[in-house]
């Protein structure tokens, strides 16, 4: 083996001395020494001929213009002396190499030593996390959270009960501190909803009173263009980990504003698909979104109806704080059906126009529940009752001003591409899913 290595060494030197080969750089290799090593010699984690760096026989040594012939002669002399090199004691050579500890320090496993951290300020806690390798609060945010946080000045909302990101061993469980009353998600005396009838009809039907629908949204960003135009899937959660597909949504590529197509057919998310249920369209700034059903705005037999309007408060000055949103829905009749409102009908006003004119007779106004600032966690928190486990600027709960404890809808992140979405009366699956899609969309001037 030693003879073969020396032959290969000589061949490489001869090959590099030939015309047309790229010569080695004159930069010196100075690897930083690890503080854990007591050996004072500089080490290079190379095996084979590269271990002779720094020796007179370095194959990467700098060659001058008139040194090619000298190198050629040296190569021939080394070939002639190869037999004498075989007499070197192999055990001494192995012992010499092993004493250099030729282990790549960059590939060595890093052991994180956990140490208790005393309560401290955010700045000192940040440096402490860097020393002990603890993930920071921002590590739980995805790229959309960073974009909304840096551009819009919004702050992420943390589920209540999750420990401080600046403390060791933060728990990732929902809080049980608040009582599960009739207004809380999953409260007593409330049944979990199930699909009744056909999917296309069920997703448009308002939820019955006293029934809670627990859903899950999955974001699919795999594929050529799904990094910019992901597909979102809505499933109804059932017992024992089972789930039922309800809706799918994707952002249209060729559109002047954000435009999402929603369909109950996961294989065909297009405007002309049989499963087309409606769409979500935003204004230029991404501050206002309107939800429409599958009707045709040019038709008089089945006109397009307004299902909801989502308005995000602008934040021109960039003040830090949770994102504020207002959701306007059509009012409900005595038999728990939506009031038909169509902005496409020139004879009547749409939901947004009615809200701007303060004509609240046939519309319902919802707001996001204001998160509470927690001094211990140094973040805004909401009690999601265990349904949301990660902080995000997209986490929210919708309530009515007359009953802030009755959560109409809540939405939040549980992993990088998985979100929970729970809704109840008077929302339907289509409305709730569209509201969640508006939260995913990028917002330049929103808080």
UniProtKB/Swiss-Prot annotation:
Instruction: Report the principal subcellular site.
Output: cytoplasm
The record's subcellular location field reads: Cytoplasm; Nucleus; Cell projection, Cilium membrane; Cell projection, Rhabdomere
Q: Which Pfam families match?
A: Tub
Sites where Phosphoserine occurs are at 136
Keywords per UniProt: Cell membrane, Cell projection, Cytoplasm, Membrane, Nucleus, Phosphoprotein
**Which stretches of sequence are listed as region Disordered?**
54-84, 168-191
Q: Write out the biased-composition intervals (Low complexity).
A: 62-84, 168-182
Lipid bilayer topology: Peripheral membrane protein
- Can you list the disulfide-bonded cysteine pairs? none
Annotated membrane-spanning segments are none
Give a GO cellular-component term.
rhabdomere
In the record, biological process GO terms are: protein localization to cilium
The family this protein is said to belong to: Belongs to the TUB family.
Protein name, entry field? Protein king tubby
